[in-house]
Structure formats: structure tokens, C-alpha cells
């Protein structure tokens, strides 16, 4: 068969096992972080592969690990608690990795084994379903994906006969000049019948310069045994693009982000500048959301219908309500209510909850705070470890002093409270419903409902202080001249 793979969205089948190869060292990444754990659109590379295996509906998912084992296992176990973990032994090679991987499968498993690489993040479940379907319909022993590349350098070439049938995989180092001109390459995605795979792996040796057990040798073993092999090209080579260095990681991130953005645009989201907008795979946006330039919507953030986010805004695992506006803001693990406004230059730290029609304005930092519906923190304030009721107003420059050097304490502000400018609320303290505080007040004691809390002494003007304390200075001379001069017109008003 020489036609391209038809991605037709075959239904899930529980008779599928997936083996994910995540044992490689990834030296070309030049990183302390294992290659398969490098982040891409909010998930590690291997996380994308695990998610695809889950969507495929595989009955068993096996991850083969070796280098930086503990780090990889921690992440895999968190993302896919039911995944089976198998350690590759000292025998290197992809063939050996699969050989140890299938030992985790039940002895009686007779379905299909799909082999994936942990560094191929864009491959989707629809493509795999179609690959498995083609494998079953043709009753193949092995069906593999291929891709046609403008630059196939470094990849194993697919050799076909005159009739277009698959004949072999030839690695670059073994290819003739004519074979090197072939642009169809092995994509490293395979479907085996379980029993055929078990028999084949036992026949693969390590008679090569690297003394490795190569999975690609399985094709030769099956062919010599008279088995059926089919190689199906994918229409979209990005689906099988592997990540080996940071250049490829950036290219994959750009491509995946473009696909994510296009999907949301087709779903009714306005994105003004896709080049400067980044959206993670787990983020969710409703129709009629507007995303302005320079915006990142990360993690499991959700943005409800009619909301506007940006410009220059970062949301991490943050919920934005309907018709809310969030501009030039950094928010993490926050909840922003419907029709609320945030920004510009606001910093919403974890635990911030802003009620419907509330406001967090310019140069405001919040943390672990619940702000009720219609309440406002308009500007230049720090509000931490606090509860603010509904329809209250926090004056400019307010500081909620929540830390005594040892422990954090909470501040409670009731409904319809008006805090004066430059207040310091020293927690723990309560400001009662309907109360006011004077400008510049340092509130250390509870303010009863309906009261006015003040802590600033009455103003006293010390006439002549500048001349007495700073004689001969320009300020003193100017003060004397002003005192001796004509009265200010404003004083007669």
C-alpha cells in the first residue's frame, strides 16, 4: 500500500497496549533536565505522549525509563497514575527497550502493541486510531508510519519496491548515494501484533557497531519470516517530529501554538496577534473571548464568554469570568469574577478571588484574599491574607500588614466599608460593616460597624519652623519672603 494514512477517527479499542520509550539520555538538549521532561505548551514532552495514549483508549500504557529514572518516573506517575513503569537494563537500544517494556503486559494479551517515542509530542490519537485500523484491516504483523521531509538527513530511509510495497528501513550511515536521495523516512511509530512482536524481538541481535538492539531491525526479521509489513506516510510531518535539541523544541512550540490558536479562532475566539500570543494545551476559552497582543494563557486557565484578556497579560491556572477585563496583569491560581476589571500592572498571586463586578486596579498586589462583589482595590495597594466584603472600597496606598515576623494573620473587612488612603491594617484586625477609616490611619484595633477609625493626631502647624531650624537656607529665605509678601488670592476665597 502506497497511499497516505487516512485519519478517519476510528473509535477507541481496549485491545491496545502502548509502549512509550522514555529511556534516552537526550545529550543534545545539553540540560540537567531529562529530555522527555522539557516543557511544551504546559506539559512535558512525555506528557503529550501519555495524553495521546489515554485518548487512544489503550488498555495498558507502559513507559520504559532509564536515564534520570527517578525524575521521569515522578512526572509519569503524576500525569498517568495507571501507567506501568519498566526499567531498561544495561543492554542499549530501542529494540531492547520494547522487549523489556512488553514484559509488563499480561501473558494473555493478544491485541496490538503501539510503540511511541517520548519525545514526539504532536502525534494525535486520531492518527494512531487510523494506523491501528489500517493494521487490523490488512492483518499486518507490523504497520509503521513514515513521513516525507524536505531534508531527510539523519533519518532512516524507507525503501520500496517497484510496486510501492515496503521493503526495508535503511539507516543513513548504511545508505547508498541513491538511497540518500529518498525523502521518505521512518517516523518511529509502530503497530505490532503482540505475539508477532514477542517472537520478533527475540530474533533481533546486537551485531552492529554500537552493540545496540535496534527496533528497526524488527522489520527485516518479519520480512524474512514472510510476515506482512505496511508503511503508511502521514500527510502532516509535524505529527511525527521528534525533539532532540532546543532548536527543534522551539520549532515544535511555535508550530503547536499556531495550531492551538487556530483551533480557538475557529471556535469563536478573537486573537489579535497570534505571533505574540501563547496558549497552553489545557487552557479553555469560550466564544467571544478577545485576546490582545502579548498575552500568555497558561496551565489550566479558563476564560469565559465575552472576557477580554491583554495586552501584555499572563494567566497561570486562572479563571476569568464572563465579560471581565484583565489587562497588563500577572495572575496565578486566581479567580476573577464576571464583569470584573483587573489592571493595569496588577499582580494576583495564588488564592486571589475577585467577586463579580469587582476591581483590582493599577499597581495592586494581592495574595490569598477574597474580595466580594462590587468591591474595589483601585490602586497602589498590597492586600494579603484578607477577606473583603461586598461593595467596599480600599483607598490608594493601603497596606494589609499580614506578617508579624513569625506568623501570617488575616484581616476581615465587612460590606460597604470605605478605607482611607494610605491606611495600614495591622492583622489580625476586623473592620466592621458600614465603617470608615481616616486617611493615613494605622489600624491596630477592631473598628465596630458604622464607626470611623482614625489614628492620626490633629494637625498642628509650627509657624516659623523653617527659619528657626534652617536659617539662611533658600527655603528659609523663600518662606520669609512669602510671609512678608501679599496674601495669596486663594486665602480670601
UniProtKB/Swiss-Prot annotation:
Its main location: cytoplasm. Binds 1 Mg(2+) ion per subunit. Residues 470-493 are annotated as: Disordered. It catalyses: alpha-D-glucosamine 1-phosphate + acetyl-CoA = N-acetyl-alpha-D-glucosamine 1-phosphate + CoA + H(+); N-acetyl-alpha-D-glucosamine 1-phosphate + UTP + H(+) = UDP-N-acetyl-alpha-D-glucosamine + diphosphate. The keyword Cell wall biogenesis/degradation applies. GO terms for biological process: cell morphogenesis; cell wall organization; lipid A biosynthetic process; peptidoglycan biosynthetic process; regulation of cell shape; UDP-N-acetylglucosamine biosynthetic process. It is found in: Cytoplasm. Residues 268-493 are annotated as: N-acetyltransferase. Pathway: Nucleotide-sugar biosynthesis; UDP-N-acetyl-alpha-D-glucosamine biosynthesis; N-acetyl-alpha-D-glucosamine 1-phosphate from alpha-D-glucosamine 6-phosphate (route II): step 2/2; Nucleotide-sugar biosynthesis; UDP-N-acetyl-alpha-D-glucosamine biosynthesis; UDP-N-acetyl-alpha-D-glucosamine from N-acetyl-alpha-D-glucosamine 1-phosphate: step 1/1; Bacterial outer membrane biogenesis; LPS lipid A biosynthesis. InterPro entries: Bifunctional_GlmU, GlmU-like, GlmU_C_LbH, MobA-like_NTP_Trfase, Nucleotide-diphossugar_trans, Trimer_LpxA-like_sf. Its cofactor is Mg(2+). GO terms for cellular component: cytoplasm; membrane. GO terms for molecular function: glucosamine-1-phosphate N-acetyltransferase activity; magnesium ion binding; UDP-N-acetylglucosamine diphosphorylase activity. It is an enzyme of class 2 (transferase). Acetyl-CoA binds at residues 396, 402-403, 421, 439. Keywords: Acyltransferase, Cell shape, Cell wall biogenesis/degradation, Cytoplasm, Magnesium, Metal-binding, Multifunctional enzyme, Nucleotidyltransferase, Peptidoglycan synthesis, Repeat, Transferase. Residues 1-246 are annotated as: Pyrophosphorylase. Catalyzes the last two sequential reactions in the de novo biosynthetic pathway for UDP-N-acetylglucosamine (UDP-GlcNAc). The C-terminal domain catalyzes the transfer of acetyl group from acetyl coenzyme A to glucosamine-1-phosphate (GlcN-1-P) to produce N-acetylglucosamine-1-phosphate (GlcNAc-1-P), which is converted into UDP-GlcNAc by the transfer of uridine 5-monophosphate (from uridine 5-triphosphate), a reaction catalyzed by the N-terminal domain. In the N-terminal section; belongs to the N-acetylglucosamine-1-phosphate uridyltransferase family. HAMAP family: GlmU. Homotrimer. This is Bifunctional protein GlmU. It comes from Clavibacter sepedonicus (Clavibacter michiganensis subsp. sepedonicus). The gene is glmU.
